[in-house]
A protein has these predicted regions:
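Extreme N-terminal basic, low-complexity initiation segments
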Residues: 2-9, 16
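Conserved nucleotide-binding/hydrolysis micro-motifs of P-loop NTPases
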Residues: 94
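Asp-based, Mg2+/Mn2+-dependent phosphohydrolase catalytic module
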Residues: 28, 32-70, 74-81, 89, ...
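Non-core capping and flanking segments associated with repeat-based/extracellular domains
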Residues: 22-25
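Short hydrophobic targeting helices and cationic amphipathic motifs
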Residues: 7-10, 27-29
Length: 306
């Protein structure tokens, strides 16, 4: 294709080049050429002016389940200084208040933790509206019990008596292999499963763990129907703030959820490459990897830095 450029567009009234207009045009070229720009040298600050709202993943971007990354907190502070909004949007299968408490114990300020919104909270709203009186079988660890605290009397121990399945993760004593869930679920594919975390895996420090999404995938492969809550599905974006016509950048380390969610919503995206996909990125051409996942990534950064 051919683009004609009037250089006067980039100049202000005093004939000085307008840096903001140049940056906007640079972003435009990256978009139409489907190029991924690496921000490791320039930092997020090089493109932050262009956006009004930032959806930022928690696990793998802000913390690793054990410690908070200092550079990511600097990013949040700088976004605030620019009078722009950020939302810490996470596929955690628990209510907002539980996850906020969890990261505060790691040292997060309450002012920052108040920006946390979870897939569990989105699922909870749906469950209270549609399934509050129905009996369910819970698949997941005890730490997720807070999700259904207001209707815990409907939780039953016998899966055969359940009207629906609520999946928040894996049982603590069955969290290494998925074959157990194939046997557990095969006779119950006519029931609906509500999955509160579409993520397939997560890294807790240096240990990789299965998430609820892996169990839901087993259920779907058996022929069951799953109602998902969390990225990449749209409901989770709308629970936290009014988007209106604001320019949005989604930041995360997961191509299946963070980046695909941005693509579904027509938002720009930044992939943190030293996260879930770090080994795949090392072993593959980055463009081929994105093609394999069928996603478009606008920016790449090894770790979130300003």
């Amino acid at each position: 294709f051919h683009i004609e450029i009037d250089q006067n567009y980039f100049k202000s009234s005093n004939e000085i080049y307008d840096v903001k207009k140049i940056k906007e045009f640079d972003l435009f070229l990256s978009y139409i050429c489907e190029m991924t720009k690496n921000l490791d040298k320039e930092g997020l600050k090089s493109v932050a002016d262009y956006y009004d709202l930032f959806f930022i993943d928690l696990w793998g971007v802000i913390h690793n389940g054990i410690e908070i990354y200092k550079s990511s907190i600097e990013v949040l502070n700088e976004i605030t200084k620019l009078n722009k909004e950020y939302i810490l949007l996470t596929n955690a299968p628990r209510p907002n208040v539980n996850v906020r408490s969890f990261i505060e114990k790691m040292g997060m300020d309450k002012e920052v933790s108040s920006k946390v919104y979870t897939s569990g909270e989105a699922a909870l709203d749906y469950l209270i509206t549609n399934f509050k009186e129905k009996k369910f079988f819970h698949i997941g660890p005890p730490r997720d019990f807070g999700l259904f605290k207001t209707f815990e009397d409907n939780k039953i121990k016998d899966i055969n008596e359940a009207e629906y399945l609520l999946c928040t993760g894996l049982f603590d004593n069955q969290n290494k292999e998925l074959s157990f869930y194939n046997k557990l679920l095969v006779a119950h594919i006519k029931k609906i499963m509500v999955c509160t975390n579409p993520d397939l895996i997560v890294d807790r420090g240096k240990i990789r763990e299965y998430c609820a999404g892996s169990v839901a995938k087993v259920f779907e492969e058996l022929g069951g129907k799953v109602e998902y809550f969390g990225k990449p599905y749209p409901k989770v974006y709308n629970q936290a703030t009014k988007i209106n016509n604001r320019k949005v950048l989604c930041i995360g380390d997961n191509l299946n959820t963070d980046i695909r969610g941005a693509n579904f919503q027509n938002y720009n995206s930044l992939l943190i490459s030293n996260g879930i996909h770090r080994e795949e990125i090392k072993q593959n051409n980055i463009t081929n990897l994105f093609d394999r996942y069928d996603v478009k990534v606008n920016f790449l950064q090894s770790q979130l830095k300003w």
